[in-house]
Amino acid sequence: MNIFEQTICDWTAKVLNNIDDSRTWDTSSFNELVEKPPNPDMGDYALPCFSFAKSLRRPPFQIAVELAEQLQSYISPETPLISIQAKDSYLNFTVSAAVMAEVVLPDVFCGKYFTEPSNISRERVMIEFSQPNTHKGFHVGHMRNVALGDSLCRIFCYNGYDVVGANYIGDVGAHIAKCLWFYSNYNTETPPEKFRGEWLGELYTHAVKKLDEAEGQEKIKFQKEISQIQQKLEAKDEQFIQEWEKTREWSLLDFQEIYEWLDVSFDHIFYESEVDEEGRQIVIEGEKKGIFQYSEGAIGIDLEEEELGFFMLLKSDGNTLYSTKDLALAQHKFDQFGVKRSIYVVGAEQTLHFKQVFATLKRMGYEQVDKCFHLPYALVILSEGKMSSRAGNVILFSQLRKEIIESIQSNHLGEHRQEWSKKELEETAQKIAVAAIKYGMLNQDSNKQIVFSMDDWLVSEGDTGTYLVYAYVRIRSICRQISREVVADVDFSLLAHPNEKKLLRQMLDFNRTVFKSGEQYRPSLLARMLYEFSKDFSRAYNTCSVKHAETEMLQAARLLLFHCVAETLLQGLHLIGISPPERM
């Protein structure tokens, strides 16, 4: 809560206690009620009066008028609030721009504003995200999960949580048996030098196609061969384990290169192969204890009481399922890492699965399950429809990277080819590319489907990551053009233009927005705030010139303002996983 919100709550509590003796009104009664008006012309803050109606026994709009009249007496030249008005059932408060600037700019300038939230000690949180499968290509559809999880890790860390970013790589399963079956029996190609994991994904697609097209005895033969490979892998047959380890490493090297390019890291990586047998033993022991039951030779748990049906945990042939391994994985998270909150960033199609997993963990006695949360997200599709590794209609990472870098170097950096070094051109193109991809994956709520369009996402105007980094670079360029040093000791009262005040208000709201983005699992809130912030800067740039300011004092004040806008934008971009270049 900032000084203005605190003042609103303190004054309102005093007035309510004067007019209502039926209870004691405390500041904490409505510190969560203070909000931002839908229209900035209405004021800087709003307080709805609906929750006061029951106690005061009169309509909210009447309460708003009465409170506004009494609150006027608190306003003076020394107070941060300069206007209080009743509008319908709301109280609208206007803040002094000079006081707002004096409060926020020095703290942003010295960096204190961005360190205060992380001083709050909160619980340990594990955020599990990405979860790619080896022996399959990493494609553009995987980027949404990566962008969501990485941003949440950064946001939770900023908000003071002890964050463990985790990956859970699918390195066992039927898809691997199919891939190795085709690789061993039908492949005639030499593995490429780079992105061999993607190449394995192509073999997997060929395997699926060959299996789907087979009929009769041939299909039975193929299925039997694949089943035998699966059994040999589970039995740790030396020949197939060596093939599995070699090809698995190809995929892991692909993933490592992709994460480095995207500037994404993990504190811990789990592998399905590591929890496979452990999950089996958990289920067997659970059956002995009466937690789980046999059903037609398989083992599962009856979740009818939770209206979640029968949840199978172990197949009748003894083979494990995703559910088997998820129980072992959760146990590791709780026992080995001591997490108090566990977040799973996984596609919306797994919603029922996670409801069943969490219900099963609760039956097993894990109280932490109440703080387990599945963050579902909708698909990323192409303009022609849904992507599928099985069908092979995906944009693979290597193709995406090549095409997006070529487009950026041609359309955005072409004029710098003669003057910039090759290294700077490549690094700048990579930063713009990552900004375009990550912002495109984050600027909508996770339940909204995304249509991927590289051309649209690379436009330097409008709601794109490219626009955001352009705004940042532009601000830095403006500040470099001014020969004077940026200082915090300025006349804050000179920052009186409405467009300057909008920027101040956005900076003042920054930490609140970041906190809400974490608690609501919605990085989209921060992404959209950064877009609005960048638009507000463009308006201020056109109306509040730094270079052509009327006086040196005004130039110093605006230079500080624009410098702080750049610092806030930089911090916000970092929290959604974007590192902007310093020039473009």
Label each residue range with its predicted role:
Residues 105-106:
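Beta-lactamase-like hydrolase cores
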Residues 1-101, 110, 116-584:
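Non-catalytic interaction-recognition regions
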